[in-house]
A protein has these predicted regions:
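Structural/interface elements that position substrates and couple domains in central-metabolism enzymes
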Residues: 1-273
Length: 273
């Protein structure tokens, strides 16, 4: 159940008792019932999602620094996330945020601020940094591919997160076209079986399972954090002697690839390979 139920109404005396009765089952479980004006409810929604987007963007920028300094971003996330004033949620370094809410709501909040001539520079910089994130990830993949002479790239997952078929503003939609422009062969496996959005790219191959993808690639990109991607025995599945992995979700620990022929790259952590 949610932490709170926010009701936006300009007639709270009439509406509040009705809706409080409707939401009573989850209120009894601890959800807070908040009644505000319609404008306030809208701003609560935008501000909440902008704040979460800011946390994601912050840890992604810290991950950039960690990669240059040889520090493990997971240690940083744990160190600051255990502070109850901050909290550990949304402090996982990875691709740019996407989906149906964060991109839309941050932009709506920025547009609203412009309409009222208020400069929300923080929110605008979050939007800008998140857009740059897609370019940075694409360049990271291209650099690894060039260094290791890799041509066949396979994406494990293309949705913006696990347990959904939602492709809206998924970082894969920004990264894959950049890879195609560099004459790399792209394939992908998506647990939902979704093909619709990427089907317009005739050069992209859809694989029916993770095994087909891994056996036909020399460079695997772990893009979405599906549970089925968390315990793959890459040595067993792939016979490729120069297999490289770029784990955009940090699903594996770098130590798992010590003394193995696989080159393992992740986000904001030391390289092992």
């Amino acid at each position: 159940y949610p932490d709170r139920v926010v009701i936006g109404t300009n007639n709270s005396k009439k509406i509040s008792p009705i809706l409080k009765k409707l939401y009573d089952p989850i209120i009894k479980k601890g959800a807070k019932f908040i009644v505000v004006s319609r404008k306030a409810a809208e701003l609560i929604k935008y501000a909440a999602n902008a704040f979460l987007a800011t946390k994601i963007t912050f840890i992604n920028e810290i991950a950039n620094l960690c990669e240059k300094t040889g520090i493990n971003v997971d240690d940083i996330a744990e160190g600051i996330g255990t502070d109850q004033r901050i909290g550990s949620r949304f402090l996982r370094a990875g691709p740019a945020y996407g989906g149906s809410c964060f991109p839309k709501d941050t932009k709506a909040l920025a547009k609203t601020s412009d309409d009222f001539k208020v400069n929300l520079s923080l929110v605008k910089n979050v939007i800008r940094s998140n857009g740059n994130r897609n370019n940075l990830i694409a360049q990271k993949i291209l650099k690894i591919a060039k260094q290791n002479h890799l041509k066949k790239i396979g994406f494990l997952g293309v949705t913006f997160k696990a347990n959904t078929d939602d492709m809206r503003d998924s970082s894969s939609l920004f990264i894959i076209p950049k890879l195609l422009k560099n004459n790399l062969k792209i394939s992908y496996y998506e647990p939902t079986g979704s093909k619709s959005v990427l089907s317009k790219y005739k050069k992209i191959k859809y694989c029916i399972n993770q095994k087909e993808l891994i056996t036909n690639c020399d460079f695997v990109i772990i893009h979405s954090d599906w549970d089925e991607f968390k315990n793959i025995d890459f040595n067993k599945v792939s016979k490729n002697k120069k297999l490289s992995i770029c784990d955009l979700r940090n699903l594996y620990h770098p130590d798992e690839f010590k003394n193995k022929k696989i080159k393992y790259y992740s986000i904001g952590r030391p390289f092992h390979g």
